[in-house]
Curated annotation (Swiss-Prot):
This is Protein FAM110C. Disulfide bonds: none annotated. Interacts with AKT1; the interaction is transient and follows AKT1 activation. Interacts with PPP2CA and alpha-tubulin. Residues 15-46, 131-145 have a biased composition (Basic and acidic residues).
Amino acid sequence: MRALAALSAPPNERLLPRDPAATRDPDAARPARRSAVERLAADRAKYVRGRPGTGRGVASEGSGPGAIKCPGNDPGPPARAPAPVARRAIARKPLRPDSLIIYRQKCEFVRGSGADGPRASLVKKLFQGPGKDKAPVPRTGDEGKAGNPETVPTTPGPAADPAIPETPAPAARSAAPSSVPAAPPGPEPRVVRRRGLQRSQSDLSSRYSAALAESDTFFQYCGLDPEVVEALGRENFTAGSDCVTLKVRSVSVATSGSGFSRHSGGDDEGLQEEELIEQVPSTTSVIERNARIIKWLYTCKKAKETPSQEQSRTRGSKPSR
């Protein structure tokens, strides 16, 4: 270690003395600096994937002096190499089958006169692009109109010849899809459904009438089984209210001609309520009628149970004796 100069010394004397090697030329001691092109050529193998033979050649060319003179020729080929690889990968992807079908249908509708029906026109509107396919048709017509009159007769001749074989092909193609959907069977099921509705209405009416008849018979015979009704006699189940109403009507007609006319000229205001009650028999109300029916059913039930009870009593009394 060398001692530093005193702090009071001038700044020139404070500096350390230089080594003898420092007096040499600094450029001679430093290594030669490579240019950017050389460095790119040397590092190209790290970033660019090429064929095994091309990497060595590129490295040798970059190290030589020729690479410095023509730097634009070397980076071109490796930069273009990855592009075809991506194109190949895209071409290898399989297309969807539905996309192929759509493309074929679009081509068929564009080529020929496939717009015979409404369905074809709808499909054509769906598949046609925004004016791409419709643009060439008016252009050809405009060109034919704008042309000279001498060229007009010459153009339709050759144009008509290829048009003749082209038109039948799309017509046949359009006929095939039109024959596939069966339009006439559509209204047939509708007619069948209408017939079914009419039958269902008749069935409902018949069922309704049958239900009403069953309810009438049920209430007429008090809900008893047909065997019990036949045993008791159907004549006993006639509705008494009908007979009563008939009698009331006949009595009212008779009194209107005799009773009221007799007392109309007298001092009395007419037949009083007591006289009407005496002349017209009292009609049973619905509640009273139902009560009588319930009482009668209860007596019938008791009559059926009594023989069984008597038999059980006799059986129980025999061992006691």
